[in-house]
Regions:
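Membrane-interfacial amphipathic/re-entrant helices at transmembrane-helix boundaries
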Residues: 1-21, 50, 60-62, 89-94, ...
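Inter-helical junctions in multi-pass inner-membrane proteins, predominant
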Residues: 2-18, 158-163, 189-231, 251-264
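Transmembrane helix-bundle core of multi-pass membrane transporters
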Residues: 10, 85-86, 91-161, 188-191, ...
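Helix-loop-helix "hairpin" substructures at the membrane interface of multi-pass membrane proteins
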Residues: 15, 133-213, 237-243
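Short, non-helical or kinked segments that cap or interrupt transmembrane helices
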Residues: 26-48, 88-93, 164-167, 190-191, ...
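Short loop segments and helix-boundary regions at transmembrane helix junctions
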Residues: 31-39, 73-116, 158-165, 170, ...
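Membrane-embedded helix boundary and interhelical linker motif in transport proteins
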Residues: 32-77, 81
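Cytosolic-side transmembrane-helix boundaries in multi-pass membrane proteins
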Residues: 81, 112, 172-180, 184-187, ...
């Protein structure tokens, strides 16, 4: 029993780590640009397939370093051509656009790489379990959690101590004032969008190494990532971090005692949080609250 419990809690933490990376990218874009990016899961898929394509040439480590920035560059192009013209308009326009874009990415990856699942080869030593008793905890699972921790730490350092991060935080509070100070708001939005898509691409590489690839894999991570933002509090990146981990662990624990409700529990959690705290657990004005 204890092994089953430990397995599901560990699995929940790992899934929660994916939710955190995805949700932080979504939250960055939403907070500054007021864009609900339904194509975020599609960019995760793009990152994974880029890693799959280049791994035979530069290895897994090279793909891990190269695929996320390449995904961010693709995101920049999409933002410049499709999303930027919709800034300042009703958010429904960008929501519908990214919703359609998600289907375009899914069909595009299916056309280029085929509908069959694709494996991404990871280093052999990462595929080994830690011990016979903890056979379900492989080195790669711990590696994924470590990468997420490093990425989240670097993101918060960027937002707290760099000029770009300070401008992003200021723009979240009052974009008009930032523009009045002579800061290029369009460039700020673009760079912020690229950071968010970078996180999606990184999530895709990590997920591909664990789960393999298929064109629809981003869809399964997208809605829980939105729920993580809502539970943690819209506008709060620390809240998004906590929300992602909470729903991951809750899903894992529920799988032990009530397997049929393991997916539904995150929606129940969202409903309870909204009833008790409509702004979420940490929701306040401003993204670093």
């Amino acid at each position: 029993m204890w092994q089953l419990l430990l397995f599901n809690v560990t699995n929940g933490l790992i899934i929660g780590a994916f939710y955190v990376l995805m949700a932080l990218g979504l939250s960055l874009i939403l907070n500054l640009s007021n864009v609900i990016n339904f194509a975020h899961g599609g960019f995760l898929v793009i990152g994974g397939y880029i890693a799959y394509t280049i791994t035979p040439y530069i290895g897994f480590w090279g793909a891990l370093l190269l695929a996320p920035p390449l995904t961010a560059i693709i995101g920049l192009l999409v933002e410049r051509v499709l999303i930027r013209p919709l800034y300042g308009r009703d958010p429904l326009y960008s929501l519908l656009l990214t919703f359609g874009l998600a289907f375009m990415i899914e069909d595009g990856t299916r056309f280029i790489w085929g509908p069959q699942g694709k494996p991404v080869t990871i280093p052999a030593f990462l595929a080994q379990p830690l011990s016979n008793d903890l056979f379900f905890i492989t080195g790669y699972r711990l590696f994924m959690v470590a990468v997420v921790m490093v990425a989240v730490t670097l993101l918060f350092l960027l937002l707290r101590y760099t000029r770009l991060g300070i401008r992003i935080r200021a723009g979240t509070l009052d974009l008009e004032t930032v523009a009045a100070l002579g800061i290029n708001v369009q460039m700020l939005r673009s760079l912020n969008f690229a950071v968010g898509i970078f996180l999606a691409g990184l999530s895709g590489v990590l997920a591909a190494g664990q789960l393999g690839l298929e064109p629809t894999m981003g869809t399964g991570l997208l809605m829980p990532s939105f729920i993580a933002i809502i539970v943690g509090g819209i506008g709060s990146l620390p809240g998004t971090l906590v929300g992602g981990l909470l729903i991951g662990v809750a899903s894992g624990l529920t799988a032990v005692f009530l397997p049929a409700a393991s997916e539904a529990v995150i929606y129940v959690m969202m409903a309870v949080v909204l009833l008790l705290r409509p702004r979420g657990l940490f929701g306040e004005e401003g993204m670093m609250s």
